[in-house]
Swiss-Prot record:
Pfam families: G3P_acyltransf. GO terms for molecular function: acyl-phosphate glycerol-3-phosphate acyltransferase activity. It is found in: Cell inner membrane. Catalyzes the transfer of an acyl group from acyl-phosphate (acyl-PO(4)) to glycerol-3-phosphate (G3P) to form lysophosphatidic acid (LPA). This enzyme utilizes acyl-phosphate as fatty acyl donor, but not acyl-CoA or acyl-ACP. One of its GO terms (biological process) is phospholipid biosynthetic process. Its main location: membrane. It catalyses: an acyl phosphate + sn-glycerol 3-phosphate = a 1-acyl-sn-glycero-3-phosphate + phosphate. Keywords: Cell inner membrane, Cell membrane, Lipid biosynthesis, Lipid metabolism, Membrane, Phospholipid biosynthesis, Phospholipid metabolism, Transferase, Transmembrane, Transmembrane helix. InterPro entries: G3P_acylTferase_PlsY. It comes from Pectobacterium carotovorum subsp. carotovorum (strain PC1). This is Glycerol-3-phosphate acyltransferase. Its EC number is 2.3.1.275.
Amino acid sequence: MSVTALGMMLIAYLCGSISSAILFCRIAGLPDPRQHGSGNPGATNVLRIGGKAAAATVLVFDVLKGMLPVWAAYALGVSPLYLGLTAIAACLGHIYPVFFHFRGGKGVATAFGAIAPIGWDLTGLMTGTWLLTVLLSGYSSLGAIVSALIAPFYVWWFKPQFTFPVAMLSCLILMRHHDNIQRLWRGQESKIWNKLRKKKQPEDEKTSPEE
């Protein structure tokens, strides 16, 4: 392993450790996502406690902190295997952030950003897979699970040299979703539409006149 590859993995982990959900909620005066909603500091939980704009902001930053280190490593000539390890390091930072007592999110958006530099065709397929699954099922977690399962096959088709590291990344995402998988199996998982309604109801109560 070269010094460059090792350095990029360290940088990727530190970038991943910057929790945009926690920081944005602090700046915006929103509740700590680790202590409200699902307890997960990620875009989906921020959607529940802060609304669409807050969730979109967190989503963009979570994608970028996976994308930028991998792109930088690619520009520096890091080999495919270590590019994959750089991507995994960014996701590990998001999941176990050193700056936030190692309590982070599930790494889906960061993983998506880390895979994006492989190619825009792959990025489009991954986006389409997630969106289609969510639209058909209503479950954001199921979209992440299906995308993680199918990602190695997409990568094998477009850029086979990245298949192994992407498969490792997919395993990491699936492990982080074991609770969601159990809730889906038992029919207890909350649909994303319900999260939007729960956010809207308190706002309606605040703005409605007293009877």
